[in-house]
Each structure stands twice: as C-alpha cells, then as structure tokens.
Swiss-Prot record:
Transfers and isomerizes the ribose moiety from AdoMet to the 7-aminomethyl group of 7-deazaguanine (preQ1-tRNA) to give epoxyqueuosine (oQ-tRNA). The gene is queA. It catalyses: 7-aminomethyl-7-carbaguanosine(34) in tRNA + S-adenosyl-L-methionine = epoxyqueuosine(34) in tRNA + adenine + L-methionine + 2 H(+). It is an enzyme of class 2 (transferase). Disulfide bonds: none annotated. Its EC number is 2.4.99.17. Pathway: tRNA modification; tRNA-queuosine biosynthesis. One of its GO terms (molecular function) is S-adenosylmethionine:tRNA ribosyltransferase-isomerase activity. The keyword Manganese does not apply. The keyword S-adenosyl-L-methionine applies. GO terms for cellular component: cytoplasm. This is S-adenosylmethionine:tRNA ribosyltransferase-isomerase. Keywords: Cytoplasm, Queuosine biosynthesis, S-adenosyl-L-methionine, Transferase. Monomer.
Length: 334
C-alpha cells in the first residue's frame, strides 16, 4: 500500500491547542465495524456503549518533563530533549547545536548533568544522566515536551492535562492521549456499570510523532519502546475472553503492547508495527484520538477498522469540526 492512501485534508484550526476541561467533555465518535455506522456523542457517555464485564486496558505510563536546558563547558546554551527511555539514567536524546560529541558534559544544574555517550544519527545521541535519582532531577528541572504541532511553549495547564489521572510509571516523553479523556467521574460511571479495568506500561517515545517517509507503508519501521504487561492484566484479559466479553484497548500504545506477546506477561521492548493485513488476537475494541495524516497511528487504526471506513470517519470529523490530535476529541471503534 502507498502512503498517499493514508492522507486526508485537515484545516489547521481543527488542531486542538489546549485540552478539553473537564476531561470527559471531549466529543466521542463511535464507529461500529459490523454495520459501518458512525455516531456522535460525548466522552462522559462512553459507558452507554460498553457492557458489564467488558475490560478497559489503560497505559499507566507517566510523562516526564523531558525538555532540559543546560550549558556546555564553553558557556553556550543547549537544549536536550530526552526521546527514548533506555533505563532511568540512560536515554536517547535530541540535542540542538554544533560540536556535540561523545564526552561532552552539559550542565543543567549544579547537581544535574548530561553526558553525551554516543552519536546515533543527525541530532540524536545516547546520553547518561549524572546526579542522584535522575528521574527526580528531571521532575525538578525539566519542562513538559508538549507535541511540536501545538506550536506554543509549555504552560502550567500542560503539567496537569498532558498527564492521565492514573499516570504512575515514569518514562514517557509523550502522553498516551486516548486516556486523557478519563476523569474520576467517568471512571465511577464505568465502575457502576460493571466495567473492569487493567493496566499495562508502555513508555511512549518521541518516535510517536515521526512521520512515515517511505513510499510503501509495509517498509516503515517504528522505534522500539519499553513495555511491561503484568501477570494480573493477562489473567483479567483471559477471564474477559472466557466470559465472551470484550477487551477494549485505550489507545494505540495499549494495542501494540497487548498484540506484541498475546496473552503473555511480558517485560522488554516492542517495535511492533501494525498495518493493514495484521491479525488482531487480543483487542476487540479500541479507544483512540484522531491522528496525523500519513502517520503509523492512522495506519494502525486503519488495520483495525478498515482504511476506507476510517477515512470516511475522518472526513465526517472534519465536517463536524471535531478537535484533532493529542488534546483533541476521541473515537471508540467497536
């Protein structure tokens, strides 16, 4: 398949620059794969489309303030954006400026430095964080790396709303955005209906914003990301399936995590790239946001629901002035 087949026209003003407040006030488009119907609703009414015994699987990763500002030994200012978690004190990073070489030490603060270990490719490096408890130092000195297409600086609202309410495991540099719509009030409504919850961890990397640059979509590769699927989550998934109920993945990160090692507890790395033709073994339904044209995420949802149906839904979303991307509205695919 050609990448042009995953393109669509999006007016700039439909890119959501700020989050919906409250979270559950975002709009919800409901796609039914069986009858190819499209309905329009609001996220607070999500329980109306789920059944008692269905299982919602969330990504509990926590976005770290991965944008760091420091100085080289010469005194020159430099920006470091941590892009890929390797371990708490080791990351891949984008570093701006010239003369960035292995051995360079960038001072973020007297108690926090970044050492360049290896040049990976143009502008990208492997780095070591120097200081006690690096994740705490990132929290102290870093800035939230809001998506580049927002075209604005980080604001206080982003510290709250670019994080899910169940964010727990530090390591993501981008939010698992489908989960941003869930408020305490919505979770209570879901519990009252008998909907069950489970969690995985996938540390979303900066690669989530990477456009597909190859002509044939089958040749694209996604960056490896750290994933952990606990035994308890696998057991809940199996129980749900045995009862004939649905496993609902909240976000493309959860889809990729669950389909990497179906029905197995797992901790490691996934570079699973899902495109049309993929056979889904675990996921029965999916909640997701509206994705960028020509992106691996749009290709993934097309694999799940069919390219033509998805593009028809996107055209309708544009007509009805839905809000797009990370802070935008959402979609439930049944």
């Amino acid at each position: 398949m050609r990448i042009e087949e995953f393109d669509y026209e999006l007016p700039e003003e439909l890119i959501a620059k700020y989050p919906a407040v409250p979270r559950h006030s975002a709009r919800l488009m409901v796609l039914n794969r069986k009858d190819q119907s499209i309905k329009h609703d609001t996220f607070i009414n999500l329980p109306d489309y789920l059944e008692e015994g269905d299982l919602l699987v969330f990504n509990n990763t926590k976005v770290i303030p991965a944008r760091l500002y420091g100085r080289k030994p010469t005194g020159g200012r430099v920006e470091v954006v941590l892009t890929d978690f390797i371990k708490p004190d080791e990351w891949k990073a984008l570093i701006g400026g010239k003369k960035i070489r292995p051995g360079l030490v960038i001072e973020v603060a007297p108690d926090f430095k970044v050492e360049v270990l290896e040049h990976i490719e143009e502008g990208k490096f492997r780095v070591k964080l120097l200081g006690e408890e690096p994740l705490k130092l990132i929290d102290k000195y870093g800035h939230i790396p809001i998506p580049p297409y927002l075209k604005r600086e980080e604001e206080p609202i982003d510290r709250v709303y670019y994080q899910t309410i169940f964010a727990k495991e530090k390591g993501a540099v981008a939010s698992p955005t489908a989960s941003l719509h869930f408020s305490e009030e919505l979770l209570e409504k879901l519990k009252e209906k008998g909907i069950n919850f489970a969690f995985i961890t996938l540390h979303v990397s900066y690669g989530t914003f990477k456009p597909v640059k190859v002509e044939r979509v089958e040749e694209h590769r996604v960056d490896p990301e750290y994933v952990k699927i606990p035994k308890e989550t696998v057991e809940k998934i199996k129980e749900t399936k045995e009862k004939g109920k649905r496993v609902v993945a909240v976000g493309t990160t959860v889809v990729r995590a669950l389909e990497t090692k179906p029905f197995e507890p797992f901790e490691g790395w996934t570079d699973l790239y899902i495109y049309p033709g993929f056979k889904f073994k675990v996921v029965d339904a999916m909640i997701t946001n509206f994705h960028l044209p020509r992106s691996s995420l749009l290709i993934l949802v097309s694999a799940f629901a069919g390219r033509e149906f998805i593009l028809k839904a996107y055209r309708e979303a544009v007509e009805k002035r839905y809000r797009f991307y990370s802070y935008g509205d959402g979609m439930l695919i049944l």
